Amino acid sequence: MSLLLFHLNASRTMNMEFFHRTLFVYDQQIIYKHRNLFRKFETTIPYTHVSKFFLTEGIIFSDVEIVAPGLKESIKLRYVTKRGARIAKFLIDEKTKAFGGKASAEDLENIDKIEKYIGRLYELKKNRKISQEELFIRREIFLKKIEKNNRLG
């Protein structure tokens, strides 16, 4: 089972859609889900296939675009939170470096620490030591520490 590191939702109201577009960042792959009134779309991208990740920041919202060579068109999420977009970019950049073999020892240690901590939180939730709300709170606190340490903000 893959470990969910982060998920990013696009704004439904700003995009004028019934359902929001979602990007799930797992430890092995990225999953993009989009739904229309009658159809559901889901795309799975391994980190080895991610060629570019574009982050465009506005005053309030950000736009995220992922380009992979095997896709018909690039994945675009418009009107996402700036903080969430920065964290997703950091995680995806670290994972693509790790899977591409271009990562330094410090980068690999950093991504291992993230995966171990979040994996431990999910394990505690599974054993009913912490609740779902506490899991989200602890994960957000940990991601804020990462954001502060890597100067993503």
Identify what each model region corresponds to:
Residues 143:
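Short Cys/His-rich micro-motifs in 6-15 aa windows
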